[in-house]
Amino acid sequence: MSPGQLSHAELLPDLTPVTYNDPMTHPLVLHPDRLFPADAGVRAIARALYAQVQKLPIISPHGHTDPAWFAYNEPFGDAVDLLLAPDHYLYRMLYSQGVSLDQLGVRTRQGAPVFEPREAWRLFASRYTLFRGTPSSVWLNQVFAEVFGLKVRLEADTADLYFDAIGAALKTAAFRPRALFEKFNIEVLATTESPTDTLEAHQAIRASGWQGRVISTYRPDPVVDPEHESFRDALVQFAALSGQDVYSWRGYLEAHRLRRAAFAALGTTATDHGHLTAATADLSDREAQALFTKIIAGQFTPAEAELFRAQMLTEMAKLSVDDGMVMQIHPGAFRNHNRKLFESHGRDKGADIPQPTDYVHALKPLLDRFGNHPRLRVIVFTLDETTYSRELAPLAGHYPVLKLGPAWWFHDSTEGLRRFREQTTETAGFYNTVGFNDDTRAFLSIPARHDVARRVDCGFLARLVAEHRLSEDEAAETAVDLAYKLPKQAYRL
């Protein structure tokens, strides 16, 4: 250990930030008023509201953590395996600055590259300044300070200290997945799986006797998008798991019904649909069968592929009316924009880009058929912030089936969460929204992400109190609803 460095024993037990005097390092300090309004009076109100929600259990109704973590409760590997590898927010920024994904250990289509985790972590630490002002630094600094008890900032000179301290912690029972789940005060956590998943991990969680509530979400994209590169292989698996002839229109729809029932038997309450657009359609049965025949034959145009996806959203709505699953629609991402990177590394490598998205016309066929149905609930998200006040808030402020999902992906920053409230509340109110989704693969960041959302909402509510638009007791009740009650209600948890 070099002079001035803290030992692991000194690093881990005490979570209170302290001044660290080594001239080569800087203290890591989380200010208790972070993210609250700058005005002292409004900040005091926000602080009081936050005290009402800070310790509430976490409801995580949509995300992408690995259910196998909780099924088998094996130790996490190292800092890279746990904090860097699952987080495409991090490697998209690093890639933008010329860092190769191979240097970070990101899997290619041929498998994991040969790399040294410590060197990857050193590289990340030396570029950590890139994340200043981003939500990633807010989340990670809270993880470093509150989960691992680290007391100095991550930078080149502290890279090894971090890597060793995190590695030592991950070898202890307190940092196993289930122990962290309980430490984080998570009441329910939803993962996301496709219809071709065997759900073995979720079955193992149920069989283990562990009391943590981890449920799946039904995401049928691989068997609904004929332009997905794995579509034909996915259909083979879909047929095997459902026992249906998925190459006939009736058998295909029945396979969805049966797989949804299998998910529901393990606690699933929601579906998710990550389509390029929000387009929906309401074809006659004859038209739908004719279109499906083209899709299965592989003889379709891009417009017909889009029409099929649109029809399938309406078919999913019909199934949700029957089985009660809440629909989530996450449209508007131009996926795999970097063709060369997609060819070498595959999907979900930080190369997805937001694009303009229409909702008023796109959703109308589905809403014409089901928009007033008492059993249907559809939660709509956007990457196109221009639609908040023009389209989404008015739609959710009218149709009983619609709710607004929170600021998503590129916009779940402090500023993005504020913009969402500022642009939707006047028309949709608070109670046509659904609280917060962390929507992450980065398990350790979940408490930090929810904490940021709670702080931002308390700051927004505090301003309404300061402007005498809400009383403080109304604001406190609303803060609790946004943090806890609304996500439970919206997702039927």
List where the protein language model places each region:
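Short, positively charged and aromatic/hydrophobic N-terminal segments
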Residues: 10, 14-20
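C-terminal amphipathic alpha-helical interaction region
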Residues: 327-329
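Hard-cation-handling environments
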Residues: 338
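Active-site loop ensemble at the mouth of alpha/beta enzyme cores that anchors a bound cofactor
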Residues: 342-353
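Divalent-cation-assisted or electrostatically stabilized phosphate/pyrophosphate-binding catalytic cores
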Residues: 356-362
